[in-house]
From Swiss-Prot:
Top-level taxonomic group: Bacteria
Segments forming domain Fe2OG dioxygenase: 78-180
Keyword hit for Iron: yes
Any Pfam family matching the protein: PKHD_C
One GO MF term attached to the UniProt entry: L-ascorbic acid binding
Keywords assigned: Dioxygenase, Iron, Metal-binding, Oxidoreductase, Vitamin C
Designated name of the protein: PKHD-type hydroxylase Nham_1514
E.C. code: 1.14.11.-
Entry binding sites for 2-oxoglutarate: R171
Source species taxonomy: Bacteria, Pseudomonadati, Pseudomonadota, Alphaproteobacteria, Hyphomicrobiales
Protein source organism: Nitrobacter hamburgensis (strain DSM 10229 / NCIMB 13809 / X14)
Binding annotation for Fe cation: H98, D100, H161
Length: 229
Protein backbone atom coordinates (compact mmCIF):
# COMPACT_ATOMS: atom_id res chain seq x y z
CA UNK A 1 0.00 0.00 0.00
CA UNK A 2 1.40 3.37 -1.07
CA UNK A 3 -0.23 6.22 0.84
CA UNK A 4 0.28 9.99 0.59
CA UNK A 5 -0.23 12.17 3.66
CA UNK A 6 -0.61 15.89 2.87
CA UNK A 7 0.32 18.78 5.12
CA UNK A 8 2.45 16.99 7.70
CA UNK A 9 4.49 20.19 7.97
CA UNK A 10 3.07 23.67 7.46
CA UNK A 11 4.72 25.83 4.81
CA UNK A 12 6.24 28.08 7.50
CA UNK A 13 7.79 25.02 9.14
CA UNK A 14 9.20 23.86 5.80
CA UNK A 15 10.73 27.30 5.22
CA UNK A 16 12.31 27.19 8.69
CA UNK A 17 13.68 23.69 8.05
CA UNK A 18 15.18 24.82 4.75
CA UNK A 19 16.73 27.96 6.24
CA UNK A 20 18.49 25.85 8.85
CA UNK A 21 19.45 23.03 6.48
CA UNK A 22 20.77 25.30 3.73
CA UNK A 23 23.35 26.66 6.17
CA UNK A 24 24.39 23.21 7.42
CA UNK A 25 27.35 21.00 6.57
CA UNK A 26 26.43 17.92 4.52
CA UNK A 27 28.26 14.62 4.07
CA UNK A 28 28.34 11.78 1.56
CA UNK A 29 25.04 9.90 1.75
CA UNK A 30 26.75 6.54 1.39
CA UNK A 31 27.78 6.72 5.05
CA UNK A 32 24.41 5.23 6.09
CA UNK A 33 23.91 2.88 3.13
CA UNK A 34 24.15 -0.89 3.18
CA UNK A 35 26.72 -2.65 1.02
CA UNK A 36 24.37 -3.04 -1.95
CA UNK A 37 22.74 0.39 -1.70
CA UNK A 38 26.13 2.12 -1.48
CA UNK A 39 26.87 0.97 -5.02
CA UNK A 40 23.96 3.01 -6.45
CA UNK A 41 23.58 5.86 -3.93
CA UNK A 42 24.77 9.32 -4.95
CA UNK A 43 23.49 12.06 -2.67
CA UNK A 44 24.30 14.03 0.48
CA UNK A 45 22.99 13.73 4.03
CA UNK A 46 23.02 15.70 7.23
CA UNK A 47 25.23 13.81 9.72
CA UNK A 48 22.70 11.39 11.24
CA UNK A 49 24.13 11.59 14.76
CA UNK A 50 24.42 15.38 14.76
CA UNK A 51 22.36 17.69 16.93
CA UNK A 52 20.78 19.35 13.90
CA UNK A 53 19.36 16.14 12.44
CA UNK A 54 18.09 15.05 15.85
CA UNK A 55 16.41 18.40 16.56
CA UNK A 56 14.70 18.58 13.17
CA UNK A 57 13.80 14.90 13.38
CA UNK A 58 12.07 15.39 16.72
CA UNK A 59 9.99 18.17 15.19
CA UNK A 60 8.90 15.79 12.44
CA UNK A 61 7.98 13.04 14.90
CA UNK A 62 5.88 15.53 16.89
CA UNK A 63 4.04 16.48 13.70
CA UNK A 64 3.50 12.83 12.78
CA UNK A 65 1.99 11.87 16.12
CA UNK A 66 -0.56 14.69 15.69
CA UNK A 67 -1.56 13.64 12.16
CA UNK A 68 -4.63 11.32 12.12
CA UNK A 69 -4.11 10.11 8.54
CA UNK A 70 -0.51 9.11 9.26
CA UNK A 71 -1.51 7.25 12.42
CA UNK A 72 -4.36 5.50 10.60
CA UNK A 73 -2.21 4.39 7.67
CA UNK A 74 0.94 3.43 9.57
CA UNK A 75 -0.34 2.23 12.97
CA UNK A 76 3.18 3.01 14.21
CA UNK A 77 4.90 1.17 17.03
CA UNK A 78 8.41 2.64 16.65
CA UNK A 79 9.59 5.47 14.40
CA UNK A 80 13.26 5.54 13.46
CA UNK A 81 14.90 8.96 13.98
CA UNK A 82 14.36 10.87 10.71
CA UNK A 83 17.33 11.39 8.41
CA UNK A 84 17.77 14.14 5.81
CA UNK A 85 19.16 14.06 2.29
CA UNK A 86 19.59 16.29 -0.72
CA UNK A 87 20.13 15.65 -4.40
CA UNK A 88 21.98 18.37 -6.30
CA UNK A 89 21.71 18.52 -10.09
CA UNK A 90 25.22 19.89 -10.59
CA UNK A 91 26.65 16.87 -8.78
CA UNK A 92 24.65 14.32 -10.79
CA UNK A 93 22.87 12.99 -7.73
CA UNK A 94 20.50 10.03 -7.94
CA UNK A 95 19.77 6.76 -6.12
CA UNK A 96 19.54 3.61 -8.22
CA UNK A 97 17.12 0.77 -7.66
CA UNK A 98 17.47 -0.84 -4.24
CA UNK A 99 15.55 -2.28 -1.31
CA UNK A 100 15.90 -0.96 2.24
CA UNK A 101 17.49 -3.01 5.00
CA UNK A 102 15.04 -5.21 6.92
CA UNK A 103 16.32 -4.01 10.30
CA UNK A 104 17.69 -0.59 11.24
CA UNK A 105 19.61 0.24 14.39
CA UNK A 106 20.25 3.68 15.86
CA UNK A 107 23.73 4.04 17.32
CA UNK A 108 22.82 6.85 19.71
CA UNK A 109 19.72 5.38 21.34
CA UNK A 110 20.21 1.66 20.78
CA UNK A 111 16.79 1.50 19.11
CA UNK A 112 16.34 -1.40 16.69
CA UNK A 113 13.28 -1.71 14.48
CA UNK A 114 11.92 -3.98 11.81
CA UNK A 115 11.41 -1.72 8.81
CA UNK A 116 7.80 -2.30 7.82
CA UNK A 117 7.28 1.06 6.12
CA UNK A 118 9.58 3.54 4.41
CA UNK A 119 8.73 7.22 4.57
CA UNK A 120 9.79 10.19 2.44
CA UNK A 121 8.81 13.70 3.59
CA UNK A 122 9.39 16.22 0.83
CA UNK A 123 11.07 19.52 1.77
CA UNK A 124 11.39 20.98 -1.75
CA UNK A 125 8.52 22.14 -3.94
CA UNK A 126 8.11 20.15 -7.18
CA UNK A 127 8.84 23.26 -9.27
CA UNK A 128 12.20 23.75 -7.56
CA UNK A 129 13.83 20.82 -9.36
CA UNK A 130 13.56 18.57 -12.39
CA UNK A 131 13.88 14.81 -12.06
CA UNK A 132 14.23 13.48 -8.54
CA UNK A 133 11.07 11.39 -8.72
CA UNK A 134 10.69 8.64 -6.14
CA UNK A 135 9.77 5.52 -8.12
CA UNK A 136 8.29 2.65 -6.10
CA UNK A 137 7.70 -0.76 -7.65
CA UNK A 138 5.00 -3.16 -6.48
CA UNK A 139 2.84 -5.95 -7.90
CA UNK A 140 0.80 -3.40 -9.85
CA UNK A 141 3.73 -1.68 -11.58
CA UNK A 142 5.85 1.41 -10.96
CA UNK A 143 4.56 4.50 -9.16
CA UNK A 144 6.26 7.89 -9.55
CA UNK A 145 5.92 10.19 -6.55
CA UNK A 146 6.80 13.89 -6.39
CA UNK A 147 4.84 15.73 -3.71
CA UNK A 148 4.55 19.33 -2.47
CA UNK A 149 6.88 20.36 0.34
CA UNK A 150 5.45 19.28 3.69
CA UNK A 151 3.70 16.19 2.27
CA UNK A 152 4.92 12.64 2.78
CA UNK A 153 4.52 9.22 1.22
CA UNK A 154 4.44 5.85 3.00
CA UNK A 155 5.21 2.62 1.19
CA UNK A 156 6.25 -0.93 2.15
CA UNK A 157 9.95 -1.06 2.97
CA UNK A 158 10.13 -4.34 1.07
CA UNK A 159 9.52 -2.48 -2.21
CA UNK A 160 12.19 -1.96 -4.82
CA UNK A 161 12.52 1.79 -5.31
CA UNK A 162 14.79 4.48 -6.72
CA UNK A 163 15.22 8.24 -7.06
CA UNK A 164 15.67 9.42 -10.64
CA UNK A 165 18.59 11.77 -11.43
CA UNK A 166 18.02 15.41 -10.51
CA UNK A 167 18.71 17.44 -13.66
CA UNK A 168 17.90 20.94 -12.36
CA UNK A 169 17.88 22.46 -8.90
CA UNK A 170 18.04 20.67 -5.56
CA UNK A 171 15.73 18.07 -4.04
CA UNK A 172 15.68 18.08 -0.23
CA UNK A 173 13.77 15.54 1.85
CA UNK A 174 13.59 13.67 5.12
CA UNK A 175 13.50 9.89 5.00
CA UNK A 176 13.03 7.30 7.67
CA UNK A 177 11.39 3.99 8.54
CA UNK A 178 8.93 2.70 11.06
CA UNK A 179 7.83 -0.54 12.63
CA UNK A 180 4.07 -0.91 12.58
CA UNK A 181 1.95 -2.65 15.18
CA UNK A 182 0.51 -4.55 12.20
CA UNK A 183 3.35 -6.29 10.39
CA UNK A 184 1.44 -7.51 7.32
CA UNK A 185 0.94 -4.85 4.65
CA UNK A 186 -2.28 -6.40 3.34
CA UNK A 187 -3.82 -6.49 6.82
CA UNK A 188 -2.69 -2.93 7.51
CA UNK A 189 -4.19 -1.77 4.23
CA UNK A 190 -7.58 -3.33 5.06
CA UNK A 191 -7.57 -1.70 8.49
CA UNK A 192 -6.76 1.67 6.92
CA UNK A 193 -9.60 1.32 4.42
CA UNK A 194 -11.99 0.37 7.22
CA UNK A 195 -10.91 3.32 9.35
CA UNK A 196 -11.33 5.69 6.40
CA UNK A 197 -14.86 4.39 5.82
CA UNK A 198 -15.71 4.72 9.52
CA UNK A 199 -14.54 8.35 9.60
CA UNK A 200 -16.70 9.09 6.56
CA UNK A 201 -19.72 7.54 8.30
CA UNK A 202 -19.02 9.52 11.46
CA UNK A 203 -19.17 12.75 9.46
CA UNK A 204 -22.52 11.79 7.93
CA UNK A 205 -24.26 9.89 10.72
CA UNK A 206 -22.50 10.93 13.91
CA UNK A 207 -20.21 9.04 16.24
CA UNK A 208 -23.11 7.55 18.21
CA UNK A 209 -24.83 5.95 15.21
CA UNK A 210 -25.34 2.22 16.03
CA UNK A 211 -23.80 0.94 12.79
CA UNK A 212 -20.84 3.27 13.18
CA UNK A 213 -20.32 1.98 16.72
CA UNK A 214 -20.47 -1.61 15.45
CA UNK A 215 -17.91 -0.96 12.71
CA UNK A 216 -15.66 0.83 15.20
CA UNK A 217 -15.77 -2.30 17.34
CA UNK A 218 -14.76 -4.42 14.35
CA UNK A 219 -11.86 -2.02 13.69
CA UNK A 220 -10.54 -2.36 17.24
CA UNK A 221 -10.99 -6.12 17.23
CA UNK A 222 -8.97 -6.41 14.02
CA UNK A 223 -6.22 -4.31 15.61
CA UNK A 224 -6.41 -6.56 18.66
CA UNK A 225 -6.13 -9.65 16.44
CA UNK A 226 -3.15 -8.47 14.37
CA UNK A 227 -1.25 -6.04 16.59
CA UNK A 228 2.21 -6.88 17.94
CA UNK A 229 3.04 -4.56 20.83
Amino acid sequence: MLTCVPGVLEKDDVADFRRIMDAAEWEDGRSTAGAQSALVKRNEQLPPDGDLARTLGNRIISALTANPRFISAAIPLQIFPPLFNRYVASDGHHFGVHVDNAVRGDRMTGLRIRTDLSVTLFLSEPDDYDGGDLVVEDNYGSHEVKLPAGDLVLYPASSLHLVTPVTRGTRVASFFWLQSMVRDDHARSMIFDLDTAIQSLVERLGRDDPETVKLTGIYHNLIRYWAEV
